Design a protein with these regions (language model features):
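Sensory modules in modular signal-transduction proteins
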Residues: 1-36
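Sensory helix hotspots in PAS and closely related PAS-like folds
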Residues: 36-37, 53
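PAS/PAS-like sensory domain cap-loop motif
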Residues: 37-47
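PAS-family sensory/regulatory domains
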Residues: 45-59
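Soluble sensory domains of the PAS superfamily and closely related sensory modules
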Residues: 58-79
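Per-ARNT-Sim (PAS) sensory domains and their PAS-associated C-terminal
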Residues: 75, 79-91, 99, 105
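Sensory coupling linkers of modular signal transduction proteins
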Residues: 97-124
Length: 124
């Protein structure tokens, strides 16, 4: 099978929800275009290479580390619900990133919007 990395990157790049990938030291490795736009007031693309922990308060940082520790405790621990954003009507999860051997290599925040789509169907 050919290398699928370009396909996977394109899937993430086209997602309308923010995707921010972090390593286990909480360094932001990648932000998709939606994340760059959504976090523009906090620095947008300039956040890449910086610590995600600098974007949160001490309480949030503690919870982030608690979740990462939980991910590390078992290869069965891969997703956890973190909160509901009422204003944007979305649920937010933290998701473990693992290599082919199941070793934890990082994490990302997953946004699931609950509002009905407003885009016209098949609006070419």
């Amino acid at each position: 099978m050919e290398n699928l990395n370009a396909y996977f990157k394109s899937v993430i790049d086209q997602d309308t929800a923010s995707v921010v990938l972090c390593d286990l030291q909480h360094t932001i490795l990648y932000m998709n275009p939606a994340a760059i736009r959504n976090y523009a007031k906090r620095g947008g693309a300039a956040l890449i290479g910086r610590s995600l922990l600098h974007c949160h308060n001490a309480s949030s940082n503690s919870r982030i580390q608690e979740v990462v520790d939980w991910f590390a405790a078992s290869p069965e621990h891969n997703i956890i619900y973190t909160y509901h954003n009422e204003k944007q009507n979305k649920d937010v999860y933290m998701v473990a990133l693992r290599d082919a051997d199941g070793t934890l290599i990082g994490y990302y925040e997953k946004h699931e919007y609950r509002s009905p789509e407003t885009m016209e169907r098949y609006a070419f």
